[in-house]
Amino acid sequence: MAKLGVNIDHVATIRQARGGVEPDPVAAAAIAELAGADGITIHLREDRRHIQDRDLKLLRQTVKTRLNLEMAATDEMVNIAISVKPDMCTLVPEKRQELTTEGGLDVRLNLESIKEAVQRLQDGGLIVSLFIDPDPDQIKAADKTGADYIEIHTGAFAEARDWKSEQAELAKIENAIKLAGKLGMGINAGHGLNYANIRKVAALGGIEEYNIGHSIISKAVLVGLDRAVRDMVDLVKYA
């Protein structure tokens, strides 16, 4: 049965919009866990635009399920991860001007630097995942780094505007699942997944955990976080 990791970055985004102390992502994480989330995901960006160092440290102390830290493959972030010790580190690309992560890591182009970051994190006792597009060359490169997991970037599927394009993207995801499985890598997925499209990806099988944030927080504004998480748990686990 697949798991749901709830990304709470946008709780911090709302807090930072006013520079205050609420809503607190630490409290949101507790509610998400009580509602059935299997894990909590956060992205500590280099520019600290939403999640802050304080949040990471408190979440490490309070999260009862699993804490997944999305991070750039920089010396600063690697050192922070080794110090705080989340349950998983997911290496993601990062651009200061982007509103959200726009694509997967180019592991082929940056193989040596990513491999070094993976090794340092693993030497620190951490499980490492790479956020990549469902591209066979990127998956093979990810395997060469020694990473434990890949997280399939589902953004292109989520943004498909017609049935033909959607089916083509689903086929890429399905092939990525098969290839990563053959290579012995764990498989997660995320980006752009919502209440309307998650069943289509979940029906493929083979994915261990879905990391979903924006759609859950958007629904939470209307119906509350507990209800929003419970509804997504039902879709992920019983697709």
UniProtKB/Swiss-Prot annotation:
This is Pyridoxine 5'-phosphate synthase. Its EC number is 2.6.99.2. HAMAP family: PdxJ. It is an enzyme of class 2 (transferase). One of its GO terms (biological process) is pyridoxine biosynthetic process. Pathway: Cofactor biosynthesis; pyridoxine 5'-phosphate biosynthesis; pyridoxine 5'-phosphate from D-erythrose 4-phosphate: step 5/5. Homooctamer; tetramer of dimers. The keyword Glycoprotein does not apply. Keywords: Cytoplasm, Pyridoxine biosynthesis, Transferase.
